[in-house]
């Protein structure tokens, strides 16, 4: 089993809410940035997605807040594939956000697919993208699911 991909961030003033802790949507922003960075590392840059006329689209995003994160703290965001359809169209990813001391602060689970940017329909990705997704670190509970959108 491969270690999760990990990205580090420092909480900015703009990431805070009026209570002085990390704004709820900032967790999702960090998760999205970590996801995009992982794809970039596999060669799927924004420019490459534009060439393919393909992009990721989310259907569901579930966030579980466990511990408070405050201003100027450093956090680490892990990314793992938690599910992939047999044809590669649909996928699930899990992001865990850890405080600098290793405390799990938040878990973000997302479910998405690949969108054909011309037809605006869900599309089977090219083989090179399916291969990249298959190489991504996986959660312990990773599951392959059928070609239809997972529930």
Where are the regions that the model predicts?
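Short structured motifs
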Residues: 59-66, 78, 92
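A broad, structural micro-motif
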Residues: 22, 56-58, 105
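Short histidine-centered beta-strand/loop micro-motifs
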Residues: 18-21, 67-68, 73
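Hydrophobic pocket/interface hotspot
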Residues: 20, 79, 120
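Hydrophobic residues in beta-strands and at strand termini
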Residues: 9-13, 65, 114
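Short, basic/aromatic beta-hairpin or loop at an interaction surface
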Residues: 47-56
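HotDog/MaoC-like acyl-thioester-processing domains
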Residues: 3-7, 40, 69-74, 82-151
């Amino acid at each position: 089993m491969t270690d999760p991909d990990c990205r580090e961030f420092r909480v900015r003033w703009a990431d805070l809410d009026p209570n002085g802790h990390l704004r709820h949507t900032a967790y999702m922003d960090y998760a999205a940035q970590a996801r995009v960075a992982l794809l970039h590392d596999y060669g799927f840059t924004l420019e490459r997605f534009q060439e393919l006329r393909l992009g990721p689209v989310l259907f569901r995003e579930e966030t579980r807040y466990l511990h408070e994160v405050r201003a100027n703290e450093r956090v680490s965001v892990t990314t793992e594939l938690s599910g992939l359809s047999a044809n590669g169209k649909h996928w699930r990813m899990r992001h865990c956000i850890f405080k600098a001391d290793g405390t799990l602060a938040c878990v973000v689970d997302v479910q998405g697919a690949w969108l054909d940017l011309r037809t605006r329909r869900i599309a089977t990705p090219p083989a090179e993208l399916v291969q990249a997704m298959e190489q991504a670190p996986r959660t312990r509970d990773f599951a392959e699911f059928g070609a239809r959108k997972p529930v």
